[in-house]
From Swiss-Prot:
Keywords associated with the record: NADP, One-carbon metabolism, Oxidoreductase
InterPro entries registered for this protein in UniProt: DHFR, DHFR-like_dom_sf, DHFR_CS, DHFR_dom
Name of the gene: dfrA
GO molecular function, one term: NADP binding
Annotated protein name in UniProt: Dihydrofolate reductase
GO cellular component, one term: cytosol
Organism (species): Bacillus subtilis (strain 168)
Keyword Glycoprotein part of the UniProt annotation: no
Function statement: Key enzyme in folate metabolism. Catalyzes an essential reaction for de novo glycine and purine synthesis, and for DNA precursor synthesis.
Highest taxon in the source lineage: Bacteria
Length: 168
């Protein structure tokens, strides 16, 4: 099963200069809680922005340079490799970047979205998609405070039709 986990602003922005445009510790804690013990799939640039494999997860890096080595990670060179890894019932999490979200969106079964009710400057966006193809399963309002200075909510969607039709 392929799940996406991401945070985006009011304009679907997810990144700026290969980093997050915001600092939201509660979202990082949510990400850790949801993905711990699972496989996480990321593009090369996302791995480089993190700088290391994330603990208690199987880290999988997708890169078009098949000779690349990322210590502590499994390296794959195609979307077919990702689909093979995630073909079973175990939940695999795509964690970025923007191109990987776009390429794998037709295969996504579940979306874990942190929606930040603020507008930021940046250069990477989550792909547009038709929310009518997705069922909102859970919603939790985040707590705005001095460390988390924006209004935000945690949303979880499941694809209504599992035909892999895309949902765009």
């Amino acid at each position: 099963m392929i799940s996406f986990i991401f945070a985006m602003d009011a304009n679907r922005l997810i990144g700026k200069d290969n980093d997050l445009p915001w600092h939201l510790p509660n979202d990082l804690a949510y990400f850790k809680k949801i993905t711990s013990g699972h496989s996480i799939i990321m593009g090369r640039k996302t791995f480089e922005s993190i700088g290391r494999p994330l603990p208690n997860r199987k880290n999988i890096v997708v890169t078009s340079a098949p000779d690349s080595e990322f210590q502590g990670c499994t390296v794959v060179s195609s979307l077919k490799d990702v689909l093979d890894i995630c073909s079973g019932p175990e939940e695999c999490f795509v964690i970025g970047g923007a191109q990987l979200y776009t390429d794998l969106f037709p295969y996504a079964d579940r979306l874990y979205m942190t929606k930040i009710h603020h507008e930021f400057e940046g250069d990477r966006h989550f792909p547009e998609f038709d929310e009518s193809n997705w069922k909102l399963v859970s919603s939790e309002q985040g707590t705005k405070d001095e460390k988390n200075p924006y209004d935000y909510e945690f949303l979880m969607y499941e694809k209504k039709n599992s035909s892999k039709a895309g949902g765009f």
